[in-house]
Amino acid sequence: DPTNYGTSTVATASTRRQTFVVKASSSSGTFEVDEKITQASTGAVGKVVEWDSTLSLLYFQQERFGDFGTNSTTGDHSVFTGANLITGGTSSATLTPSTDSETITLANNNTLSTTSGYANPELQPDSGNIIYLENRKPIQRDSDQTEDIKLIIEF
């Protein structure tokens, strides 16, 4: 079972966000989904999942793959930290992280707590098990074709 971030406690909530978040104190431009972001001063690299311009929140993933979550020069895993400028690779949007710790109210009265402008994912990466995975060859479809999809979930 997946666990809460930084603990060995099994997660019980029905929904969880598996992204890192940074709160902007200032920003310019609009970050694009799936674009590479970098923080030159730390060497951190990530990929944008969502840009919430209303709340100035940048949701991103940072995996441990070359040129995605690791420093392209050293190969080390570098985290985004401090009020160091974050830049979008394709949009050239920029963001200066907040240094405040605060609780932000999201949609449906959910909250997000940041520490010095950053929030961790709600689940511990690599916790839990992949129960079933099936890789299939691509299927050619016609534009007027209909499909029946069946999903079986057991608990």
Give the location of each predicted region.
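Interface-prone segments of viral and bacterial extracellular assemblies
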Residues: 1-155
